[in-house]
Regions:
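GIY-YIG nuclease catalytic motif and its immediate N-terminal context
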Residues: 1-35, 40-42, 49-52, 56-66, ...
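A short, polar/charged loop-to-alpha-helix boundary motif
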Residues: 71-77
Length: 80
């Protein structure tokens, strides 16, 4: 299983989108500052996730969620 996820920083309120095959481990890495783009912005809470059968599907969805139109739709869905 592969996951696409959205995290919210409890420190600055920003959202971060990513993909992984181990959601629990990846959230832990974000929270202890082991990731390049979110280092220093934690702690984080998981606010959204989707599950896919392949890495390719998850990577495509992650890329799509990071585009302008889809990012705005996701913000509306999440109520932000």
């Amino acid at each position: 299983m592969f996951y696409v996820y959205v995290l919210k920083s409890l420190k600055n309120g920003r959202f971060y989108t990513g993909s992984t095959n181990n959601l629990k481990r990846r959230l832990f890495e974000h929270n202890i500052g082991q990731t390049k783009y979110t280092k220093g912005a934690g702690p984080f809470e998981l606010i959204y996730k989707e599950v896919y059968n392949t890495r390719l599907e998850a990577n495509r969805r992650e890329k799509f969620l990071k585009t302008g139109k889809e990012r705005e739709l996701l913000k509306q869905i999440l109520g932000t």
